[in-house]
Amino acid sequence: MKSVGNLSPNTSLLFICDIQSKFENHIFKFNDVVGQSKYMIKICNELKVPIIFTEQYPKGLGHTVEDLLKERNENNQTKIFEKTLYSMCTNEVLNHLKQNHKDLKSILITGIETHVCVLQSTLDFLENGYDVHILSDAVSSNNNNDRLIALERMRQSGAFITTTETITFQLTKDAKHKSFKNIVPLSQERREYLLANPSLSSLSKL
């Protein structure tokens, strides 16, 4: 049976793709990508969903923005991989997944650029048998047109195009979830921020 994209914290992992300082002035709604990714990191820390950061040629392009790195939690598994391949699905990453996350089924992706590294990562992870969920409000490109076309391209290949809040409630499933009281304020804070900054909501538009 074809996967319908259900999620469980025990079989999911969040990838933060190349959100590096040198890209700040070259990516459409870069700050929105950072903000939504930061929210997702907090959610994953609360639910103990492991997190992998990738960095594209950090020697020349700098490291992941500090605003995201400071959200790393010693109580949750976090790993950083450097790469030159556009795809995050490097041999090093695949070996890490096979050795340390044997029950992994669902890969969640935020980051940049949607039509390059995010797209190629998605295709490679799909070919390796994983479900891939693209958080559309947390990915971007140099321009929105490339982003939109890439989202449709990934959908055609079998990825699930979704949002950070949708993922949040898919992972928790029940208002009786033990982390519900901690997650609700994070979700409310996100909603209030978007209401106060309506221009930032454009990444939610497909």
UniProtKB/Swiss-Prot annotation:
Gene3D superfamilies cross-referenced by the UniProt entry: Isochorismatase-like
Pfam families in UniProt: Isochorismatase
Recorded superkingdom: Eukaryota
Which residues are in coiled coils? none
Cited InterPro entries: Isochorismatase-like_dom, Isochorismatase-like_sf, Isochorismatase_domain
Family statement drawn from the similarity comment of this UniProt entry: Belongs to the isochorismatase family.
- Annotated protein name in UniProt: Isochorismatase family protein 1A
Q: Which organism is it from?
A: Dictyostelium discoideum (Social amoeba)
Q: What is the lineage of its organism?
A: Eukaryota, Amoebozoa, Evosea, Eumycetozoa, Dictyostelia
